[in-house]
């Protein structure tokens, strides 16, 4: 038993999962299950805050690694003899790896805990990424490099699972959105930092250009190792009390793997949220893969300037996704779950319309760089806010299979990006500008099924609740969470 702070103790349950026993600590700050009722990023002595910062920094490193290749693609092309189609194939490989990794990460979090799953995944991906960077010598090696980097984004599921477990429902939307939003800035950081790091390796260290990109890749590898070790060194998984059981545990016993999986896969709301997320976060993945090349080709910008312009999209995550989480929690205070659902539909529809406009502006005969960037930033704000709004709903779907539901929803982002890439960005049927507009139209249509999501005790967009708060003892998983507890 290790003392951490006043009236706070670290306890190990029989099955080896760690949680905090708060005793009388923090009245009004934590609920009766030990979950934080508000997000205080500057309260660094609080274990909830420490976990929050570790979670987003670990995922930041994963996003940096996953999007490290596109900004230095011009330098990698001659070294690996890449054809134009190879970049698209590698992007699909990265997204496919993200899909596979996130599907696997959900049950892993439910059975092992998000902290262990996240730390191990970061270290494994760091090793695999370093090996891929060293041995890649052909287009196939480049595809393998992007695939390995894409696997690291499985940590998004662990990030959201961890936040959903240690923050109470009144703050979970904000906590999920801020942790994911700040982490997503890693993709923007890669757009800016990787070209600068590459130039430093070539100009200051005198490394040959054919080797310089491999040396540059040591940076994301080092970030993954550092954050992975930090997460594993952190001493606890969950807060104490009733919610402090090991993930996937109902009551005091651990559920079987298949029981956990069935709980999430059998809930239609998880599938609909995955579809919706596939066309908000999926749009973000597409834009972050094509934006730098779009600006280089359409506006004839140098590598560094194109990377900076493309970084504007990812940088909006610092404020837009948290804003979505804040909006989700605020509308829930006034309108309950119906408010969360309406807000998601409205914001994502606006982002889809702006995506259509980005493509139309880029297709103009004399496009304005400033105007195109401005509309792209507005599109990013709404699309990323929609992602925050989506994960303001996820924790209420199925508490006992939270990791599976998170994994299914997060995987929907990768599936949406893969399908969109195959439909609109592969081959020569559409120009990049036309493909971006088609992406927006598809997103607009795929947002409509939000209207079908219904919670038995909270209702949906058009239908009221089908059970009263007092109930009759027939409790389903969404009853485990009250919207404002």
Swiss-Prot record:
Gene Ontology annotations of biological process type: nitrate assimilation
Cellular compartment(s): Cell membrane
Membrane topology label: Multi-pass membrane protein
One cellular component (GO) term of this entry: plasma membrane
Induction section of the entry: Circadian-regulation with a peak in the middle of the morning. Induced by nitrate and sucrose in roots. Down-regulated by glutamine, gluatamate, asparagine and aspartate in roots.
Keywords, sorted A to Z: Cell membrane, Membrane, Nitrate assimilation, Transmembrane, Transmembrane helix
InterPro entries on file: MFS (IPR011701), MFS_trans_sf (IPR036259), NO3_transporter (IPR044772)
GO molecular function: nitrate transmembrane transporter activity
CDD domains associated with the record: MFS_NRT2_like
Superkingdom: Eukaryota
Expression (tissue specificity): Expressed in the base of the lateral root primordia, root-shoot junction zone, leaves, ends of the husk and vascular tissue of the anthers.
Pfam families: MFS_1 (PF07690)
Membrane-crossing segments per the record: 56-76, 80-100, 119-139, 147-167, 177-197, 215-235, 270-290, 305-327, 341-361, 377-397, 405-425, 435-455
Entry similarity comment: Belongs to the major facilitator superfamily. Nitrate/nitrite porter (TC 2.A.1.8) family.
Function (record text): Involved in nitrate transport.
Official protein name in the record: Probable high-affinity nitrate transporter 2.4
Lineage: Eukaryota, Viridiplantae, Streptophyta, Embryophyta, Tracheophyta
